[in-house]
Structure formats: structure tokens, C-alpha cells
Amino acid sequence: MRRSTSNGAVVVPATQDGLFHDSPFPIPDSRLIAGVDEAGRGPLAGPVAVAAVVFDPGKPRINGLDDSKQLTAERREQLYARIVDRALAWSVVLIDSEEIDRINIYQATMLGMRRAVEGVAHVAGFARIDGNRVPKGLPCPAEALIGGDALDRAIMAASIVAKVTRDRLMHELHTRHPEYRFDQHKGYSTPVHLAALQTHGPCPQHRRSFAPVRLALQGREGLEPDPGTRDLEQLQVGQLVAPL
């Protein structure tokens, strides 16, 4: 079934399918490999995005692909347009902050990967996933590739699709919650974002299971953090400064 939006910037809860972009080829081919990657695992706000891309061997090779984190926003947008035009099939799934809080970020990422692969399984006979874990319940054989977003072209493409989709959404969320400046940091734990959290408290897009958000919420409610978790929470703040 074809499911799409005009701009791709829609939060898709984990209980729903992702955004599926079909091709005219209905039979999976074991020679066609889906590259899978995520964006937004570490931010304090917004969804985690997972994309899967299967290249069309009959279309020209896309030059300039790389890990999305190594590209400028302008370059990512340019490559995104080429990827979705030349891909045999692609899908992107967004798991929202509420679902992340309910099942945790690791499980949300695994679920997003499974749904993204499901979106291209009518074409791809194999999935190659960035990282060191293969989600359970995939519709085709798969392997994990550590550092795959710098090694495999399909994974590079998936990282770009996931990143661009998520960044577009964060710009949209900025118009709803301008006080947090989601357009600048995309939900990551920057000084500007942390200061806004302290001033305004969390909005519905914040991940309350993440320590800095939980601390801000507790502070506004006049609650003391659990003393045994202070060191862990400080460690998590440091880990979340850089995009994952």
C-alpha cells in the first residue's frame, strides 16, 4: 500500500506504518540490498527517524554520497532529491517522543528499523544496517555493519534521507515552539536548548525519559532528583551534546 505525504515531515507513531514509497517491481530480489540508518537517537526532543533505501541499478550512480553528519545541510538537501528520484524504493519512519518514552530509545530505534525495512521488503532481498545490532522480526535476511554510514552507499543514502526528513520536521516544530530554537539545534543538548528547558520547562515534543528533560521537569515541579542518579544524569548530559 502506498503511503506518503507532501513533504515527508509527519510524526509517525510506532503503532503505525512509516512513509512507504513504492516502485513498480513487486518481487523481492536477493541481489538488491536495502541500506538502513537512523537520525536523532540522541536529542532531547523530537522523533527518531529511520530510513531504508534500495538503489535502482538501472539508474546513474549518485556522486558525493557520504555519512550525513559529514555533509552540510544544503548538500544533504541536494542529495536527498537525487536519492528519492533514483532509488528503486525507499521508506522513512519517525517514532515520536511519546513512544520513545514508553519503550526507550533503543527499542524505538530497533522498531523504526524494522518498519523501515518492511517498507522496502517488496523489492529488497537483503538489508544492511548501520551499527552492531540487527532488529528482530525483519522480513528479509540482514547484517549489521559498524560504521556503515561511511562505508556503504545505500546506508549513506539512508542516513541522508533520515537526517533531512527529521531536520525538516524540527524546523516545523520550531514554528510551534519557537522558544526552544529547534531550528538551530534540532533538539540536541546545546547550551541554548538547556537554558530554554530551564526557563520554559519541557514541551510535548521533549523526551521525558532523558535525564536533562527529567531534571528540568522535576525542577519546575519542585521535586528533588533521586540522589543516587545524579552522577549518571551528568554523564548522560555530556553524551548527548554531540549528535549520534
From Swiss-Prot:
- According to its record, what are the GO cellular component terms? cytoplasm; ribonuclease H2 complex
Q: What is the protein's given name? A: Ribonuclease HII
Biological classification of the source: Bacteria, Pseudomonadati, Pseudomonadota, Gammaproteobacteria, Lysobacterales
Gene coding for it? rnhB
* Signal peptide segment: none
Q: Which intervals hold domain RNase H type-2? A: 31-222
- Tagged with keyword ATP-binding: no
Cofactor: binding comment: Manganese or magnesium. Binds 1 divalent metal ion per monomer in the absence of substrate. May bind a second metal ion after substrate binding.
Alphabetical list of HAMAP family matching this protein: RNase_HII_B (MF_00052_B)
Q: Which InterPro entries match?
A: RNase_HII, RNase_HII/HIII, RNase_HII/HIII_dom, RNaseH-like_sf, RNaseH_sf
* Annotated family: Belongs to the RNase HII family.
Q: Name one GO biological process term.
A: mismatch repair
Class in the EC hierarchy, top level: hydrolase
**EC numbers for this chain:** 3.1.26.4
Q: Which GO terms describe its molecular function?
A: manganese ion binding; RNA binding; RNA-DNA hybrid ribonuclease activity
**Where along this sequence does the record place binding of a divalent metal cation?**
37-38, 130
Pfam family example for this protein?
RNase_HII
Please write the reaction equations for the catalytic activity of this protein: Endonucleolytic cleavage to 5'-phosphomonoester
Among CDD domains, the record links this protein to: RNase_HII_bacteria_HII_like
